[in-house]
Regions:
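Bacterial Sec-dependent N-terminal signal peptides
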Residues: 1-26
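Low-complexity segments
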Residues: 25, 29-36, 40, 46-125
Length: 125
C-alpha cells in the first residue's frame, strides 16, 4: 500500500512538471517570428538572421520540460548568439527580456514573451 501511494505521488508530480515537446512545425513558426522581431529591433544582417534563426530553432526544439527553459539549451543559445551579434546588438538583446528569455512557464504551459510586445502573430516585417 505504501509503495502504491509513493508511486501515485511520483506519477502526479511528474505529470504537473512536464510538458510535451513542441512539434517541428510549431518550433519553426515560433523561431521565425522571434527571429523576425530580432532582425527588426537589432538590425540584423542577412547572415546574422540566418544564424539566429537556426539558433532559435535549435533552442525551441530542445525544450521539453520546465527545467529546459533556462538550462543547457538556453545557455548554449545565448552563447551562440553572443558570437554572431555585435556588442551593441548583444547588449540590446540581453536588455529585452522577450528576446533573452523567449519562453516562460505559467499554469503548466510554455508561453512566448514576445507576444506581449508584438501581439499580432501574423505580422512580419
Amino acid at each position: 500500500m505504501k509503495k502504491l501511494i509513493i508511486a501515485l505521488v511520483a506519477m502526479f508530480s511528474m505529470t504537473f512538471t512536464t510538458a510535451s515537446a513542441m512539434s517541428y512545425e510549431q518550433a519553426r513558426q515560433q523561431a521565425l517570428f522571434l527571429t523576425d522581431k530580432m532582425a527588426y529591433e537589432l538590425n540584423l544582417t542577412d547572415d546574422q538572421y540566418e544564424a539566429a534563426y537556426e539558433i532559435n530553432l535549435d533552442y525551441l526544439m530542445g525544450v521539453d520540460t520546465y527545467d529546459d527553459l533556462y538550462g543547457v539549451y538556453w545557455r548554449q543559445r545565448n552563447l551562440d548568439l553572443s558570437y554572431i551579434l555585435l556588442d551593441w546588438q548583444y547588449r540590446n538583446f540581453c536588455a529585452a527580456s522577450y528576446f533573452y528569455r523567449p519562453l516562460y512557464w505559467d499554469a503548466g504551459y510554455f508561453h512566448f514573451g514576445i507576444y506581449a510586445r508584438y501581439p499580432r502573430r501574423d505580422y512580419f516585417f
